[in-house]
């Protein structure tokens, strides 16, 4: 086998590996963040209390719904 062919195949395999690894890692992170959102109701309640607001369940539900909707919109835009 010619040396230049071996070099081309190695570079091609490296590029394909990097691209494949990127997309696999991206999919893994998207699934992970969907299952384990970075903020939950308890964190939201604590943040509202720190800001001096009285956290009612209705407000927390509204904020969680709004955050989930924004996350879904961003997912649609990225696809």
Swiss-Prot record:
The keyword Transmembrane applies. The keyword Signal does not apply. Keywords: Membrane, Transmembrane, Transmembrane helix. It comes from the Bacteria. One of its GO terms (cellular component) is plasma membrane. InterPro entries: EF-hand-dom_pair, UPF0154. SUPFAM superfamilies: EF-hand (SSF47473). The chain crosses the membrane at residues 4-24. It is a single-pass membrane protein. Its main location: membrane. It is found in: Membrane. Belongs to the UPF0154 family. This is UPF0154 protein SSP1415.
